């Protein structure tokens, strides 16, 4: 039911943008972003609390509808390294996005939502022989797909009309996740190329 309401809301925003402007499609933009942040959470079943700063990369592509609305897609991968022994929690996610932006001088603040999905995997190595290609004595591995809602806030800085710097803050929500995935805020920095 929630998915249907979110889809209807996104379609409503798109058509309201179309009704506001005579020239509906005002171009497109896209770019790459690096991110970090702080994630924490307990992984049930193995009793491990994962926390720390993830590192990741991804990108976005959007169509500009009217003066303020943009729709498109984005995708990212994020890795949270643990225990300094090769242990990790990794996320890959993406989806369709809609956002509202408003230019104020050289700044373009924006807010939006991405709806999609992804996959999370984790490898926690509790003990291994210490030798390269050594045998693992005690390790846990898990992998799971998830439905993703990703609300975000950001701001672009217009270097030129074709090149913008962007900074974005989000919190990836995974409703209905079966095992406790670490979550928390992420901050993104990157370039957006406009046409």
Indicate where each model-derived feature is located.
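Outer-membrane beta-barrel translocator domains and adjoining extracellular loop/strand segments
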Residues: 40-48, 82-88, 122-130, 177-184
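Extracytoplasmic loops and strand-loop junctions of Gram-negative outer membrane beta-barrel proteins
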Residues: 40-44, 133-139, 171-173
